[in-house]
């Protein structure tokens, strides 16, 4: 959902494309997606 994408972007300062990729890779879990981006 849109709010999950916005949450990932706001927490990681990444671009939209990267946020969507991370969410897809994490099964739509924003917390996991944020951790994934931050640990890359």
Where do the model's predicted regions map?
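Short, amphipathic alpha-helical interaction segments embedded in low-complexity terminal/linker regions
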Residues: 1-40
